[in-house]
Structures are given as C-alpha cells and as structure tokens.
Regions:
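Hydrophobic alpha-helical membrane-association signature
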Residues: 40, 565, 813-816, 854, ...
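Periplasmic OmpA-like peptidoglycan-binding domain that tethers envelope proteins to the cell wall
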Residues: 746, 808-812, 827, 835-906
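Short, histidine-centered active-site or binding-site loop motifs used for metal coordination
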Residues: 107, 799-801, 836-840
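Hydrophobic packing and interface segments
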Residues: 1-729
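Short strand->helix junction
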Residues: 483, 696, 807, 840-841
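A generic secondary-structure signal
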Residues: 50, 819-823, 861-862
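Acidic/polar residues in short coil/turn loops that connect beta-strands
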Residues: 46, 461, 740-742, 759, ...
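Periplasmic peptidoglycan-binding/tethering modules of Gram-negative envelope proteins
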Residues: 725-831, 905-906
Length: 906
C-alpha cells in the first residue's frame, strides 16, 4: 500500500504539470496584437531573460560551493548522507525552473492580455489569469514531484531494518532537507535580486518621469519604462515563484519530519511498532498526499474565475478570484478529512513539551488542518482590508495626501504598523489552537493544508504583474483610453492580490518556521530554550536584529540603484533631443543594464548575512543559542514582513485611486494634482517595502530555520558527546559534585551493572543509582517469607530533572521513569509515595505549587507507562526536608530541588 500511495502525489503532480502545459499553449495561441505591441513585449522579454541568465550564472557558482560544503558535512556527521548533495542541487534547479516558467508565460501573456483588453475586460481577465495559472501549477507540480520522487528514493535506500524505523527515517529526511535547502537558497537570491531590480527601475521611473517631468506612468518617453516592466516580471513573477516554491517544499518537509516523531512517540508510549496500511509511515507521507490533492483542488478552482460582465468593476473581478480561491480551499478541506481517516490510526501519540507523550485523537489533526486553511483565507481578508482600494486604511492615506507627502508617509507607516495587530493575533491563535489539538505535528499539518492550495494562490498573485505589464504595453503602444481603463481595473485588483499573495507567503513562513523549529529542537535533543542564560539571550537579541539590518541593506541597495537610474534618466532627458516632445527615442537598454548590474551586485551581501550568521551562531554558541537566534529571526521577521508588505500595498492603491479620480472633502482630485504627487512620493517609498525587503523576510525566516535543521545533526552530536562526558565523569571512582547547564545536580551513579528483576527483565544502571537502591530495598524487605521492612526512606531520583521554575520535565528524564515502571511491574506488591521538593529561592507558595505539580507529573507519567494509579500517591512539600540544610550554594540548592520516592509495602 505504501508504494501505491506514494505514487498518488506523483500522478497528481504530473496531472498538474500537464494542465499547466495545456494552459501555456492556450496562452501562446492568443492574438499578440500589432507589430508595435509585439516589439515592446519582445523588449520586456529579452530584458527579463537577460537578467535571469546573468543571475543564474552567479548562482551556479554558489550552488557548487554550497554542494562541496554539504558533502564535507556528510563525511563527518553520521546521520547526514552524501545524498543530501544531489537533493540540494535538484532543489536549486527546480526552484530556478519554477521562476523561469513563470517568466516565460508572464512575458508571453502580457501583450496578449493587452490585445484581449481591446475586445473586452472578461477576455483580458481570462488571458492574464491563465498566465498566472501556468505559474501556480508549475511551482506546485515541480515541488510535489521533486519531493515525492526523492522521498521514494531515500526511503528505499535508508529504511532497511538495521535500526529502529524512526532512526532510519531520520537519515532519509535529513537527505531530503537538502532539496528544501537548495530551493530556499535560490529563492533568497531570486527575491532579493529581483526586488532590487524592479524597484530600482520603478523608483527611478516614477521620481523623474511622474514627479519631475509630469508624464504618465509607462509613458514610452520615459527611458526607464522598459526596465520598470521587466522588473515586474523578475521581482513579482520569478521572485514570488521561487519564494512560494521554497515555502511549499519546506512546509511539507517539516510536516514529514514531525510525522516521523509521531511514529517514534507512538512506539515509546505503547512499546509496540507503529502499524498501518502504509508500511508504518502514514504520518510521514500524509503531508505529500495533501499537497497533491491541493493541486487538483486548485485546477478546479481556476474554472470558476470567470466573469461575463463587459463593464466589470474591481469588486466584480475580486469576487470571482475569491470564489475560485475559497472553492479550492473547501475542496482541499473535504478531501483532507477522508485522507486523515484513511492514513492515520484513530489514536496517535505525541510528545507535548512540559506534558510528556499524550494520546491524541487523529480527528484533531483534521481540525488543525482546518485552522491552517482558515488562516490562508483570513490572512487574505485582513491584507485586502488594509491594502484594498476603497477600504478605510487606504482612504485615510488618500485624505492625508491632500496636505503633502509627509502626512501621506506618516499615514502609510501607521497603516502598516497597525496591520500587524490582527495578523499576529491570527497567527498566534492558529499556532496555539493547532498545537493544543495535535502538538507540533498539528501546527505542521495546518501549514501544509494552507500551502496545499499554493497553485491557486500563486495564480491569483501572478495575474497582477501580467495585468500591470499589459497596461504598460497599452500606454506605450498609444492604444485607445478604454483599453487602458480595462487593464487598470485588472491592475488595481492585481495590486491587492499581490499584497494578499505576500500576506499568504508571510503566513506560510510563520507556520513553516515554527514546524521547522520544532523539528530542530527534536533533532538536536535540546529540551527548549532557556533565555535566562546570557549566551542564549544574546543570540535571541541578535536574531531579532537581523531582519532589521537585512531590510536596511536591501533598502540601501534599492536607494543606491535608484539613484543611478534617476541620474541616467535625467541625463537622457537633458542630452537626447526631443524625448519629451516624442520626436527623440530614449535609450531603454541603458536603464535595463543599470538595473541588472545593480541587482546582481547588491544581492550578495544580504544573502551572505542570511546564510553565514546562523552557521557562526551554531558553531560558536551551540544548539540552544542557535535555537534562540532562530526564534528571534522568526518573530522579528514576521512583524517586519507584515508591516512592510501592507504599508507598501496601501501606498500603491492610494496612488492608483488618484489616477482614476477620487473625492477628497467633497472635491474630485485627479492625476497631476498636488495630492497625487504626494501619493506618488508615498508609493515610491512603499515600493521597496512591498516588493523587495518585505517579501525577502519570508525567505530569511525559512532559510534560517532550514540551515538550523541541516546543522542539527552536528549540534546534536556535540550535545551527545557532552552527555557522554558527563556519564564518564559519573562513573569515576572519585566523583566531583557538579551541576549541568540547566542547573541540575549531576549525581555519582557508580559503575554500570545488570539487575535481573523477578519478572525476568534486565535493566542496566549504575550500582549507586536510584533503581539499584529501590531493588536492594525490595530484595531485603522479606526474610524467610516474612515482611521485615514495610517502608523505605526517601530515595532521590537521580536522573529526573525539570525545567527551571516549571513543572515541565526534561526529555532525558523519561528513561529513569521507564525503569521505575519496569521495577514496579516486577514487584506487584510495591506501592510508592512521590514527593516533590524545592529550594528556598523565590515565593514559598509558588514553590509549594511547583513541587506538587512536579510530583503529580511523575505520577501521571508512570500511569501512562502502565502503573496503576492506586499504587501511587503524589504530594508536593515545597522548601522542606532539605538534604543540604545550608541551601547557600548552587550545588546545595540543586540537591534540594528534587523528586523523591518512598517505597511502601503492606
């Protein structure tokens, strides 16, 4: 069944790619207009492909260097195979291919949309949205196909039965992480490079053309016009395609990694192998199958994006786009319900931090997926509210434009900042809700379900720049005003859908980062992030700072490139006679060259910052500090992404409103007015916000967490080495009392011995360990069949530790409690009293509660291990019965913070 199931997403991805090909050929068959229109379109296509070719040549060198580094890691880390290298290279190639497909269809669809707009708006919508559909299905189809084929290869190679299933699956998924790392690495440079290109051209064209010369947008007299239209493709098409390709892959990968831990937790909780109809890997392959189903749901959704109204308004176009989107979401939700019922057992087990392994009904996983799908829809609604034409926030910016550029910018900044409120509350509720339902696996499935309709989301998003280009071609070709009016309707909706698409990308980055973070914590074996450690807190602050510095670097790059563009456009207006009169021909090629060179040069430093910083943090500060750094980048990055995306989108639509004519204080205000010029300035500031630094935050977040995940085996092996050293220290004849990094006492466990219990079970423990003391008591309690000792003294559990100030037990404590459960199973007459104790630090009442919670946590854990509840009592004593009366040193206080048990016989 596993083999058949794994080929289902392959088949679904192939269907998606075939439908993509059909749509691409349909677009190419449409009328491309007159010779002048085709010439302009050809210039845009040549400029776009020239940039991509130059960018890919640079990235080829990066891929070679990164591949060699990954190969070196595979030689020194046991769980990392050399197969991570071909996976990385293929991920990079597929990411580049996804962007290339989008570029090809966008530069073919733009002029055909213009020609269709000469006939009717519905036909123009059909052509532009079909172009977007090609982009969406190309990204989704390649992502699912690549992931599934590599997983089939790696699972067959690594899962051979020599180790436990989950251990062997770790090898397969670690190699598969290379595919995701390759995709995100290329996406970073495509997003940053494309963003710098497009905004250098856009800002330069607007500042000199609109503000100084007073000529319309996309006027053929503007030397930067072609570069501006090329930029729409390299930034909003190729860049967005690579971005969502990376998100798609990373989300599914994170869910697969956490699915493997669901299998491991099931085995730990039940002591038996995980059995299902999919060779015991249902939780791992479920996310891929959901992704495949999302492709088909998206195809169905595309058929609903139609309108018959020749005079359709922006609201009408937005309505049919929303219909297609929500239809795809609902279809995915319904099919996901049946997939979960089919692929997961009715009950699964998961490790909840602070609570141990708990039983979870598999229907909860479905509820978590509904949360993810709802987030995808709701974030679109929130973004549309803050950036949509006619909505209150945009109208407020329009009103503030009447008093100048300064008040316009203040209003735009406030709109972006305020937009974080609802978005972050939505993310927080989604994370909390999905975690409560089904742990981190629930969070990952929520993200996977949301990303399942990526093909539809990207189709909606990519149609925007196609419509924008179509309007530019109409303007440069001197087509009738009615054609530009139709393309402006699509362009205005496209601005909102672009902002919505960026909001969707932010939501995916937030949920994906959390899922990757959970996988990282499990991979490294750390028990959480303790911010009371100076080193960890320092890394958290550095992580929070990185998105701010990254944004600054990108904004400076745009400013520098835009300055060159402004100077070049001014030079041409000054030196080439007749440009403004329409008799001279501007040198468009020079502006394209400036944008290309600036983008390629300026994208390297932000890229290096993103990749090198987490590597340095991990190697020099350790696993826990890298985890804190990842958390800092994620929280700060999400906030900055929302702020910049929505501020830029709102500024853009405020400017667009003036071009159509808008009423301010009872008076109509149009293009060319002082208020319009203020709005143009605001839009110019917002352009790099929404199209360069804002979207780059998503990849910064995901790539940081992916690098952490790839480094996790190295850092995890260091943690293991440290643990081994601690064990060696404990077995020395002379034991020096120490405390570990968490502040827990390291006890002398003595020499390792085998203890055979009456049940026949054998446990391997130290001869001075708690288990040895309990067994010694039980062995000596009877003499000649008579009970001579009814109760032991308190025995401290020497390897049961809790998070400081919490009732959350550290994961490495579970082994000792499992041994205690085994001993109690061997001695059915044995009962125990569990006591929780603390030191005197802090509030006494709180200490008493913590000690009680810890004692009850141990009791609950032992019950889950099969010990009957009536054989145990639990009580918290707080700061009482010190074993170290002075309570004046760290070691002394660590001894007093403990869990003791007292054996009772009757």
């Amino acid at each position: 069944m596993k083999e058949l199931t794994l080929w289902i997403p392959v088949a679904l991805s192939v269907i998606g790619l075939l439908f993509m090909l059909y749509k691409f050929l349909w677009v190419k068959k449409q009328d491309a207009g007159n010779e002048k229109m085709q010439g302009i379109s050809k210039s845009i296509a040549e400029g776009a492909m020239a940039f991509l070719s130059a960018e890919y040549r640079l990235l080829f060198i990066f891929v070679i260097v990164a591949s060699l580094a990954l190969f070196g890691i595979s030689r020194i880390v046991e769980t990392t195979s050399w197969l991570i290298v071909p996976a990385f290279i293929t991920g990079a190639i597929f990411s580049g291919l996804a962007g290339n497909i989008g570029m090809k269809v966008a530069t073919a669809a733009n002029v055909r949309t213009t020609q269709a707009a000469r006939t009717s708006l519905p036909k123009a919508l059909n052509v532009s949205f079909s172009g977007g559909t090609v982009m969406g299905l190309g990204v989704a189809g390649l992502a699912v196909l690549g992931l599934t084929l590599f997983f089939i290869l790696f699972s067959s190679h690594f899962i051979v039965g020599e180790r436990s299933f989950s251990e062997e699956m770790v090898f397969a998924l670690e190699a598969l992480a290379g595919f995701s790392l390759g995709a995100e690495s290329i996406a970073l440079f495509a997003r940053v490079g494309g963003g710098i290109y497009t905004k250098a051209a856009d800002v330069g064209a607007d500042l000199v053309g609109k503000v100084e010369a007073g000529i319309p947008e996309d006027d053929p007299r503007n030397p930067a016009t072609i570069a501006d239209n090329v930029g729409d493709n390299v930034g909003d098409v190729a860049g967005m395609g690579a971005d969502l390709f990376g998100s798609y892959v990373a989300t599914v990968l994170a869910a697969m990694v956490l699915g493997n831990y669901v299998i491991r937790d099931y085995v730990e909780a039940n002591g038996t192998a995980f059995v299902d109809n999919f060779s015991g890997m249902g939780p791992v392959i479920l996310p891929i199958v959901i992704a495949g189903v999302g492709i088909i749901a998206s195809i169905i959704g595309t058929f609903l994006v139609r309108t018959n109204k020749s005079d359709a308004s922006e609201a009408d176009v937005q309505r049919v786009l929303n219909l297609g989107n929500w239809s795809a979401i609902i279809i995915t939700a319904v099919v996901t319900f049946f997939l979960i019922r089919w692929m997961l057992p009715s009950t699964i087990y998961m490790d909840f931090f602070g609570e141990g392994i708990l039983e979870v009904a598999s229907i909860n996983v479905f509820y978590a997926s509904l949360i993810g799908l709802a987030v995808g829809g709701l974030i679109s609604a929130i973004t549309e509210y803050y950036t949509g034409t006619g909505k209150k926030p945009v109208m407020n910016i329009i009103k503030n434009s009447s008093t100048g550029a300064a008040t316009n910018i203040i209003a735009g900044l406030a709109t972006g900042m305020m937009s974080t409120f609802l978005s972050i509350l939505l993310f927080a509720a989604a994370i909390w809700g999905s975690y409560e339902l089904a742990g981190f696996y629930g969070v990952a499935i929520a993200a996977s379900a949301m990303m399942a309709t990526t093909a539809m989301q990207l189709a909606i998003d990519a149609f925007g720049p196609i419509a924008d280009n179509a309007g530019g071609i109409a303007e440069m070709s001197d087509l009738p005003e009615e054609v530009r009016e139709r393309t402006d309707v699509l362009d205005s909706v496209g601005n909102t859908t672009a902002a919505v698409g960026k909001g969707f990308a932010i939501a995916s980055a937030a949920l994906t980062a959390l899922a990757l973070f959970a996988a990282y914590v499990t991979f490294t074996g750390i028990d959480g992030i303790n911010i009371f450690k100076a080193k960890t807190l320092a890394a958290l602050f550095v992580g929070g700072m990185i998105p701010v510095v990254f944004s600054a670097m990108v904004m400076q790059s745009v400013g520098k490139a835009a300055m060159e563009m402004v100077q070049e456009v001014r030079r041409q207006f000054r030196e080439i006679p007749g440009i403004l009169e329409g008799t001279g021909k501007p040198d468009h090629g020079k502006c394209v060259e400036i944008s290309t060179n600036a983008a390629l040069k300026e994208m390297m430093l932000p890229g290096a910052l993103t990749i090198v910083t987490p590597i340095l943090i991990g190697f020099f500060m350790g696993a826990e500090s890298l985890g804190a750094y990842m958390a800092g980048v994620t929280v700060s990055g999400v906030l900055w992404a929302i702020f910049q995306n929505n501020a830029g989108g709102a500024w853009d639509n405020a400017k667009k409103s003036f071009e159509a004519g808008i009423e301010i204080d009872g008076k109509m205000t149009y293009k060319g007015s002082e208020a319009h010029k203020a709005a143009v300035t605001g839009d110019t500031v917002g352009d790099p916000f929404k199209d360069t630094s804002g979207p780059s935050m998503n990849i910064l977040i995901k790539l940081t967490c992916l690098i952490g995940l790839v480094m996790a085996p190295i850092l995890g092996s260091e943690n293991s080495a440290n643990s081994d050293m601690a064990t060696i220290d404990q077995s020395n004849e002379i034991h020096v009392e120490t405390i570990d990094e968490e502040g827990n006492i390291v006890y002398d466990l003595g020499e390792m011995i085998e203890i055979e219990l009456p049940s026949g079970e054998v446990i391997n423990v130290g001869n001075k360990s708690s288990e040895a003391k309990i067994n010694d008591f039980m062995s000596s309690a009877w003499v000649n069949g008579n009970l001579v000792n009814q109760q032991s003294n308190w025995i401290t559990l020497d390897r049961v530790y809790f998070k400081s100030g919490e009732s959350r037990m550290l994961r490495n404590s579970m082994d000792q409690l499992k041994y205690i459960a085994t001993i109690m199973d061997a001695y059915p007459e044995m009962k125990i009293k569990i006591g929780g104790f603390t030191d005197k630090m802090g509030d006494e009442e709180r200490n008493l509660k913590i000690s009680s919670d810890r004692a009850n946590f141990v009791k609950d854990f032992l019950e889950r291990e099969g010990v009957q509840g009536d054989r145990m009592q639990a009580e918290g004593y707080g700061p009482q019965q010190f074993v170290c009366a002075a309570n004046d040193t760290e070691i002394c206080r660590a001894k007093n913070r403990r869990i003791d048990i007292k054996v009772v016989l009757s």
